[in-house]
């Protein structure tokens, strides 16, 4: 597929939108301008409807969404996005900048929900095969910092309303997975904004230049 799929990950309030802007600015400075943006869940008509179902606390009334149903909806949205948007773009040499991908499911559902990690890995491999982002920027914040920022933005979705314990488990799984995969780079997002932006620029620049070497 080529090395041009970059994903930004992190807890709520980690600063993914700002990070995306920095990534775009950095790529443009490196002469890369042909890019598209995606978000998960979402990014297609079907995936956006699934996003509403899984995140909008009012979407199914009083019905409780089970953990496994939640996982399957995330994967349904992801597969639709990957097959109809991301892969075709990559095949044409377009850079794809994604707000979340499969690492979110491994962290939120595997860590936060406590769903069996072997089952999640098996499901991922079955529906995505060996498709992975070329570079993932994981913005690491504590739940206390991240949720304070998220709550300042206004209404929280169904997952953003989870407990601190849920987000602590999610963060722990993020860190565990990041330590295992060299394609995942951890950025300390508790730093002042200028320092976070500097780290993102340096990471992306070094990575792009390394791909071209």
UniProtKB/Swiss-Prot annotation:
<dbReference type="InterPro" id="IPR018095">
    <property type="entry name" value="Thymidylate_kin_CS"/>
</dbReference>
<keyword id="KW-0067">ATP-binding</keyword>
<keyword id="KW-0808">Transferase</keyword>
<dbReference type="GO" id="GO:0004798">
    <property type="term" value="F:dTMP kinase activity"/>
</dbReference>
<dbReference type="InterPro" id="IPR039430">
    <property type="entry name" value="Thymidylate_kin-like_dom"/>
</dbReference>
<protein>
    <recommendedName>
        <fullName>Thymidylate kinase</fullName>
        <ecNumber>2.7.4.9</ecNumber>
    </recommendedName>
</protein>
<dbReference type="InterPro" id="IPR018094">
    <property type="entry name" value="Thymidylate_kinase"/>
</dbReference>
<dbReference type="GO" id="GO:0006233">
    <property type="term" value="P:dTDP biosynthetic process"/>
</dbReference>
<keyword id="KW-0418">Kinase</keyword>
<keyword id="KW-0547">Nucleotide-binding</keyword>
<dbReference type="Pfam" id="PF02223">
    <property type="entry name" value="Thymidylate_kin"/>
</dbReference>
<dbReference type="GO" id="GO:0005829">
    <property type="term" value="C:cytosol"/>
</dbReference>
<dbReference type="GO" id="GO:0006235">
    <property type="term" value="P:dTTP biosynthetic process"/>
</dbReference>
<feature type="binding site">
    <location>
        <begin position="10"/>
        <end position="17"/>
    </location>
    <ligand>
        <name>ATP</name>
    </ligand>
</feature>
<dbReference type="InterPro" id="IPR027417">
    <property type="entry name" value="P-loop_NTPase"/>
</dbReference>
<comment type="function">
    <text>Phosphorylation of dTMP to form dTDP in both de novo and salvage pathways of dTTP synthesis.</text>
</comment>
<dbReference type="GO" id="GO:0005524">
    <property type="term" value="F:ATP binding"/>
</dbReference>
<keyword id="KW-0545">Nucleotide biosynthesis</keyword>
<dbReference type="GO" id="GO:0006227">
    <property type="term" value="P:dUDP biosynthetic process"/>
</dbReference>
<comment type="similarity">
    <text>Belongs to the thymidylate kinase family.</text>
</comment>
């Amino acid at each position: 597929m080529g090395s041009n799929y970059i994903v930004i990950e992190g807890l709520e309030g980690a600063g993914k939108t700002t990070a995306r802007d920095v990534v775009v600015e950095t790529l443009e400075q490196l002469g890369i301008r042909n890019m598209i943006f995606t978000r998960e869940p979402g990014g297609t008509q079907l995936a956006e409807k699934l996003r509403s179902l899984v995140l909008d606390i009012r979407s199914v009334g009083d019905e409780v969404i089970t953990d496994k149903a939640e996982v399957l909806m995330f994967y349904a949205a992801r597969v639709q996005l990957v097959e109809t948007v991301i892969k075709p773009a990559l095949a044409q040499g377009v850079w794809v900048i994604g707000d979340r991908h499969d690492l979110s499911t491994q962290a939120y559902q595997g860590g936060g929900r406590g769903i069996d990690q072997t089952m999640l890995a098996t499901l991922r491999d079955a529906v995505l095969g060996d498709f992975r982002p070329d570079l993932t920027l994981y913005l690491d914040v504590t739940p206390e910092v991240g949720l304070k920022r998220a709550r300042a933005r206004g209404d929280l979705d169904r997952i953003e309303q989870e407990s601190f314990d849920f987000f602590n488990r999610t963060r722990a799984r993020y860190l565990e997975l990041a330590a295992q995969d060299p394609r995942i780079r951890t950025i300390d997002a508790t730093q002042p904004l200028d320092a976070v932006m500097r780290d993102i620029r340096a990471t992306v620049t070094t990575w792009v230049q390394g791909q071209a070497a």
